Amino acid sequence: MQLTPNFSLAEMTFSETASRHGWDNTPGPREVQNLSRLANMLEQVRALVGKPIFVSSGYRSKRLNDALGSKDTSQHRVGCAADIKVAGMNPDQIGRAHV
């Protein structure tokens, strides 16, 4: 399922850890709605930086989140957070791209 032109649901939910352990990391309908909104925000960041964005961590099921040692209040759990990387840019540069 394509959420936006450049971000798919599969990309926003993929986890090497979940795959390696055979864990289901499928979000529910509410989380999919949140991921869609998040993907739209990431499209705006992509336009500002002028480069593709790699999502290293998006939605996390409770099992995955617990295995990673994250808190239950993590926004990843509800599809409202993503860890991203942009080739050739550090986090500060990405953050300043909107200025």
Q: Model-predicted segments: where are they?
A:
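Cell-envelope/glycan interface and biosynthesis
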Residues: L3-H98
